[in-house]
């Protein structure tokens, strides 16, 4: 399912993100508490001439976890090795990565929650003691040898902290949560990206794009590129607030950052299920969408923004959802009086 406001990175996103990615913490806009903390940790680490403690970065997709790892490595003045949990299939794959690190290098593992238990077992002593155990030979002749590793920093990124095992989670000395960005910070990001990409974008135009970007830089930059296309064809190339609004109308992204699927979901709960509660299976059937799509792609932002709530009996639209749909809230059944589980 292709959505302009999807947080998953496309190939175009990945190519563009490389060119607009900030290098220094000073250029990493937003996430002020994270920036301030990491600045202190990095300065202290460099003063002691040590490896930075292992870092876990978590939060919704598209908020800059990979970008932050690049910034950390740059500020430390070391190389960054990038991989992901699904790519490291065997213990030998991880051993090859670790033994090729130089002192104080940073190893970034995206989707670290998807590491297999066998690979995790190899990672534990590497993180704690900078050592790994390798099996040499097969059968009765097999034996284990220890290999010393140079001091290094592991940065793990995940959108699903609940799937991390406790032993792995406990081995990270620094844990950072990335939050959704404010419209003001997103507008600054849009203006910065526009400057790098040579896009003529007014301050008001950038603010209009930021307002509809769902608190996510990846979406903001994607919307910027699509609005640029519209501006070049329809408005002489300049993105003003009027051009941005017209482009968003064409893209069917409203002022709340909702697309057709978001509005359909809220409208279905309100119109067909009297505002809820409604079980996820019934909702998925009504929308002809997969349950996983609704749970992982559509609902998180609606819940975070207060348009939808999950209860023991199912999903309920809030008064805020009624207001967004320009409808009058109805008298609804309490979601907490009946223990029936509709999940």
Curated annotation (Swiss-Prot):
Its main location: cytoplasm. The keyword Secreted does not apply. Coiled coil: none annotated. SUPFAM superfamilies: P-loop containing nucleoside triphosphate hydrolases, Winged helix' DNA-binding domain. Pfam families: AAA_lid_4, RuvB_C, RuvB_N. Its EC number is 3.6.4.-. Keywords: ATP-binding, Cytoplasm, DNA damage, DNA recombination, DNA repair, DNA-binding, Hydrolase, Nucleotide-binding. Mg(2+) binds at residue 66. ATP binds at residues 20-21, 62, 65-67, 128-130, 171, 181, 218. It is found in: Cytoplasm. CDD domains: AAA (cd00009). One of its GO terms (cellular component) is Holliday junction resolvase complex. Residues 182-252 are annotated as: Small ATPAse domain (RuvB-S). Residues 1-181 are annotated as: Large ATPase domain (RuvB-L). It is an enzyme of class 3 (hydrolase). One of its GO terms (molecular function) is ATP binding. Residues 255-343 are annotated as: Head domain (RuvB-H). The keyword NAD does not apply. GO terms for biological process: DNA recombination; DNA repair. DNA binds at residues 291, 310, 315. The RuvA-RuvB-RuvC complex processes Holliday junction (HJ) DNA during genetic recombination and DNA repair, while the RuvA-RuvB complex plays an important role in the rescue of blocked DNA replication forks via replication fork reversal (RFR). RuvA specifically binds to HJ cruciform DNA, conferring on it an open structure. The RuvB hexamer acts as an ATP-dependent pump, pulling dsDNA into and through the RuvAB complex. RuvB forms 2 homohexamers on either side of HJ DNA bound by 1 or 2 RuvA tetramers; 4 subunits per hexamer contact DNA at a time. Belongs to the RuvB family. Homohexamer. Forms an RuvA(8)-RuvB(12)-Holliday junction (HJ) complex. HJ DNA is sandwiched between 2 RuvA tetramers; dsDNA enters through RuvA and exits via RuvB. An RuvB hexamer assembles on each DNA strand where it exits the tetramer. Each RuvB hexamer is contacted by two RuvA subunits (via domain III) on 2 adjacent RuvB subunits; this complex drives branch migration. In the full resolvosome a probable DNA-RuvA(4)-RuvB(12)-RuvC(2) complex forms which resolves the HJ. This is Holliday junction branch migration complex subunit RuvB. It comes from Xylella fastidiosa (strain M12). The lineage of its organism: Bacteria, Pseudomonadati, Pseudomonadota, Gammaproteobacteria, Lysobacterales.
